[in-house]
Regions:
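Short S/T/G/P-rich N-terminal loop/turn motif that feeds into the first structured element of a domain
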Residues: 1-50, 55-69, 86-99
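Acidic/histidine-enriched active-site and ligand-binding environments that engage anionic O-linkages
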Residues: 78-88
Length: 99
């Protein structure tokens, strides 16, 4: 079973959604280029002002977290998170997960 964590970063949208999407997309692109972790941006079906970034199977959490923090700062994406960004880390534990 893999021990590489997946990151789930959720927050409530603050400000203009188009501007936020541009900043977050640029941030995620930097993360993908700089450390090879491709993220996905999602929103809740019942509350489109709640967004989540998903980064799966992060092999080097220290480098990933540093790169994410730098990209977050560079693109000013934190300004679009009302109440801050909530970061959660999960690892696979299911019977069908690859060992």
């Amino acid at each position: 079973m893999t021990t590489a964590p997946s990151y789930f970063v959720w927050y409530r949208l603050a400000g203009d959604a188009c501007e936020a999407r541009s900043a977050v997309t640029a941030m995620m692109l930097d993360v993908a280029v700089d450390c090879g972790v491709v993220g996905r941006l999602m929103k809740r079906t019942d509350d489109p002002s709640t967004w989540m970034e998903v980064y799966e199977t992060v092999d080097d959490p220290v480098a990933f977290e540093r790169t994410l923090a730098e990209a977050l700062e560079r693109h000013g994406a934190l300004a679009y998170a009302d109440g801050g960004r909530h970061v959660e880390r999960f690892v696979a534990c299911g019977a069908l997960d690859v060992e």
